[in-house]
Amino acid sequence: SAASDVYKRQGVQGEMCNRGYNTMKGYYKNPEATAEVIDKDNFLHSGDLGIKDEDGNYRITGRIKDMIIRGGENIYPREIEEFLYKLDGVKDVQVAGIPSKKYGEAVGAFIILQEGVKMQEADVRDFCRNKISRYKIPKYIFFVNEFPMTGSGKIQKFRLKDLGLQLCKEQGIEII
């Protein structure tokens, strides 16, 4: 199966899947939910993206549902977030897909600045230029004070899309 192939390939990102005696057989009295996460070969699909290194260890690199698909290109938000953390003055950053008429989704960066730091969108784009692929450079850059959070303190990535659309509307930015 495609799931088992991920385990064999080093350096190739894919969905983290597992099976074995310690893996659940399914959700109690819920065959529909079970069918969504367990394939015909009994692999449990975690929804996490990961990569196998040269030592045979796996590293989680993100979540499948967070992946941005821009004009056929798969963009992993965590990769861009890790890059933007290197920009002086950035305290925290989250990247999410913003709906796009032309590309399906465009990259949106939500940045919390360190106290007292002033930054413009152009500063972020200049930092990215010639260092990451053009299609990964954020089309939309929003400076925010906080991210939408759950009661337990986790960032609600799925709400960033709506926040991005709202901020575009408030700022008069046309969605292309």
Positions of the model-derived regions?
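N-terminal non-cleavable signal-anchor helices
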Residues: 7, 118, 174-176
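Acidic/polar alpha-helix N-cap and adjacent early helical turns
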Residues: 163-176
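AMP-binding/adenylate-forming catalytic core of the ANL superfamily
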Residues: 5, 20, 25-26, 33-36, ...
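Glycine-rich active-site loop/lid that clamps phosphate-bearing ligands
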Residues: 16
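Phosphate-recognition beta-domain surfaces
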Residues: 13
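Short, small-residue-biased leader/transition segments that mark boundaries at the very start
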Residues: 1-7
